[in-house]
Amino acid sequence: MSEPRKILVTSALPYANGSIHLGHMLEYIQTDMWVRFQKHRGNQCIYVCADDAHGSAIMLRAEKEGITPEQLIDNVKAEHSADFADFLVDFDNFHSTHSDENRELSSMIYTRLRDAGHIATRSVTQYFDPEKKMFLADRFIKGTCPKCAAEDQYGDNCEKCGATYAPTDLKNPKSAISGTTPVLKDSKHFFFDLPAFDAMLKSWTRSGTLQDAVANKIAEWLDSGLQQWDISRDAPYFGFEIPDEPGKYFYVWLDAPIGYMASFKNLCARRPDLDFDAYWGKGATTELYHFIGKDIVNFHALFWPAMLEGAGLRTPTGINVHGYLTVNGQKMSKSRGTFIKARTYLDHLPPEYLRYYYASKLGRGVDDLDLNFEDFVQKVNSDLIGKVVNIASRCAGFIHKGNAGVMGEANAAPELTDAFLAAAPSIADAYEARDFARAMRETMALADRANAYIAEKAPWALAKQEGKQDEVQAVCSLGINLFRQLVIFLKPVLPNLAADAEKFLNVEPLTWEDHKTLLGNHQLNPFSALMTRIDPLKVEAMAAASKEDLTATDATASSAPAGNGELAKDPLSAEIDFDAFAAVDLRVALILKAEHVEGADKLLRLTLDIGDEQRNVFSGIKSAYPNPSELEGRLTMMIANLKPRKMRFGISEGMVMAAGPGGEEIYLLSPDSGAKPGQRIK
């Protein structure tokens, strides 16, 4: 028998500035299932995480609430910990990036990078709030759009007309924090020399550490050229001060991934069997895996391994990337009741129903996963209750009634138990590959065979026939053994069901190896319901509890003609003559490439094909399209004769057209099918 593997696993750190929602839970449930599977097979698998507890947003929220940042992050950590525990996410340690371990490790890594010549400095010009005495990120600057004159717009884009611009282009800029007029000020910033690791990253990202689709996307970024990464922020800032640089702080994304190391180091202090260097030292033979969403791939597949390499530490064995969660086919929405907090779900439904549903739809790719309420109810009721639990509920009563709860010795259908045994390696391979959907399909196929066998033998009919009691016991004993096998295969996904089944089966906690054996002449405990069907009304109640209170916009709306209120919120502009309209050259454009803009909170960089030429356009639609690659290959509409605008990120050569109030509700416009790039819109 081979030696148990030694594995360290992390999930992305939740930000300590808000509640956990079902989109977050997709990642933590996925990771937890994989970790439980490894432990189920006898491997030493350690799962650590932490709250991401630094940054201006936390500092400002704490100030607004009249508490210290430390009090805020402590409160949020307690909430997060309770949500994770109740969703059966079993961390070996859940820590905080605001910790002594993280301060020590962040300083150590920075110092090693600095001493190796991988840190550069240069002056950066930014808006500065003279009242709060702090530099302002783009999202903390508001003013009048230089294009359409809309007021109260952010520092890098207009949510009304979609224009993008540099913060210095904004008219009447104001600090969103204090309301004062900001001033431009220079400051020394510190940069990590990421381009120095270009060759290392090109090799590492193609070494099997990433899914192919992710490696291909990373290759695009590498081919376009890496830039030095700004790793500093100025005081006041809630975080760690940079060694030997008073008033300068590590940017949150520098110390956040180091939080993985810090959480593990904190655990090592309580676990003498764990050696920190055996997991993080250069040349470590243990395994290290990060589970993350596709929105933070650049930090984990570029910055993080380069930092580790530059600091003389090991790099990850693998980075497992997943897609986003949609609900009923759309992005989560508070108004539709589909932006569901973890606690709201738990107030209405058991956690294992969602764990199973996620598992049934999670492949090893980076595709988005849709939580469809109707499908959710049907799948849980059909698979878990109608197939798995149904086997035990059908068979247990006959064994208790006919044989005092003692299972028979004989195997009534060896060919069936052999099929279950033969399926185990494939199910294990699916778990290992994080293809949970395949593991669930193959397990449910076995459940179908078990139910078909029981239905064919019909012990309820046999029990009424004289002289058939031994056959009833044999059929039902086999049914209980098949149920036990299914529980073994499902235990990483459904730990509570497994625990309740173990009590009923009167056995020690089941391990993966137990699938190779059968129970015989074995005493069962009395059976009680292991799961109940989902009532669709509970799902409706959960959605209702998630809806924001909507305020009526017009007291007389009930008697007015039907309308959606959009014109009231955004009145029509003044009339223009035809010549003014004709001067605008609208064209169909094909999105060749869409990508995040480093340092911009709201912008995407779009490369557009308009027939005979390509254009580079910056668009403030990031909040609605967090996965920009999904836009690639799509047709849209653009203003092609808009004067190019110089921005701090580059030149924007036009404007794409979108509708919506802003935030997540921005809808990029597309022409009807058949339109071609470059065609005029008229």
From Swiss-Prot:
Its EC number is 6.1.1.10. PROSITE patterns: AA_TRNA_LIGASE_I, TRBD. A motif ('HIGH' region) lies at residues 14-24. Gene3D superfamilies: HUPs (3.40.50.620), Isoleucyl-tRNA Synthetase, Domain 1 (1.10.730.10), Methionyl-tRNA synthetase, Zn-domain (2.20.28.20), Nucleic acid-binding proteins (2.40.50.140). CDD domains: Anticodon_Ia_Met, MetRS_core, tRNA_bind_EcMetRS_like. GO terms for biological process: methionyl-tRNA aminoacylation. Its cofactor is Zn(2+). It is an enzyme of class 6 (ligase). Its main location: cytoplasm. It comes from Pseudomonas savastanoi pv. phaseolicola (strain 1448A / Race 6) (Pseudomonas syringae pv. phaseolicola (strain 1448A / Race 6)). Keywords: Aminoacyl-tRNA synthetase, ATP-binding, Cytoplasm, Ligase, Metal-binding, Nucleotide-binding, Protein biosynthesis, RNA-binding, tRNA-binding, Zinc. NCBIfam families: metG, metG_C_term, PRK00133.1. This is Methionine--tRNA ligase.
